[in-house]
A protein has these predicted regions:
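Glycine-rich flexible loops
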Residues: 1-229
Length: 229
């Protein structure tokens, strides 16, 4: 059973990455959300609150909930996207962190519904390949989680049609890294595509990168956020 000290550590971790989201312009004002499993109690999740600006958010504002959605501790309401988080955790016991962003380039690609092909080594190593765009569903509904399930089956991230980015990982560190890399890849793809079709990494090389870099990362634990080369 988890302790208050463990909850506090998780809250501080979620807040740390929430502030980074704002600093890297992966979100704006109160958009987006982050969560992580409580390490010693996989049925508990620390998640950002609803309608709370990141620059004024405090550790105690982070809400502790069960994976069935019930609030365990916290004075604020959890994010309106809570079903997206809890249902993903229930479905995927290998997921320890979730990051949902509203970053500009990725939202542009998501609005077009075209996805991001495997054009960069860093995208494949961080996310497992090209990025699929899941069909549209209204934000805050369980349908979003259902529609992202197949898009995330063998990837660390997907785009939400007309919405944003959903990234997952064995830790919140991995999920944050994936979300950040997706935005960089989306920006590069849009810039390059404006001039000519963008060559993709060969399928056999994609599989090699997945096998040697992406897949092992799920078993290594925390990863310092980087943008990949």
């Amino acid at each position: 059973m988890s302790s208050p000290a463990t909850w506090q550590a998780a809250r501080e971790r979620v807040l740390l990455f929430s502030r980074r989201l704002l600093a890297e312009r992966l979100v704006y004002f109160t958009a987006g959300n982050i969560s992580m499993r409580i390490p010693d109690d996989p049925e508990l999740v620390a998640v950002t609150p609803a309608s709370t600006p990141y620059d004024t958010m405090r550790p105690e504002d982070i809400v502790i909930v069960r994976t069935d959605g019930r609030v365990v501790d916290g004075a604020l309401r959890p994010t309106s996207e809570l079903p997206l988080h809890t249902l993903t955790y229930v479905r995927r016991d290998d997921v320890g962190g979730i990051v949902h962003t509203h970053s500009a380039a990725a939202m542009a690609v998501a609005a077009m519904g075209i996805g991001i092909p495997p054009i960069l080594h860093g995208l494949v190593s961080a996310c497992g390949g090209g990025i699929v765009t899941a069909p549209y569903a209204r934000g805050g509904t369980a349908e979003v989680a259902e529609l992202t399930a197949s898009a995330l089956r063998d990837r660390s991230a997907c785009l939400l049609r007309n919405h944003g980015v959903l990234a997952i990982g064995p830790t919140v560190d991995h999920a944050y890294n994936a979300a950040s890399v997706v935005e960089g890849a989306a920006d590069a793809y849009l810039r390059a595509f404006a001039f000519r079709p963008v060559p993709q990494i060969a399928p056999d090389e994609v599989e090699r990168i997945r096998r040697e870099q992406w897949a092992p990362a799920w078993a290594r634990g925390p990863l310092a956020p980087t943008h990949g080369g």
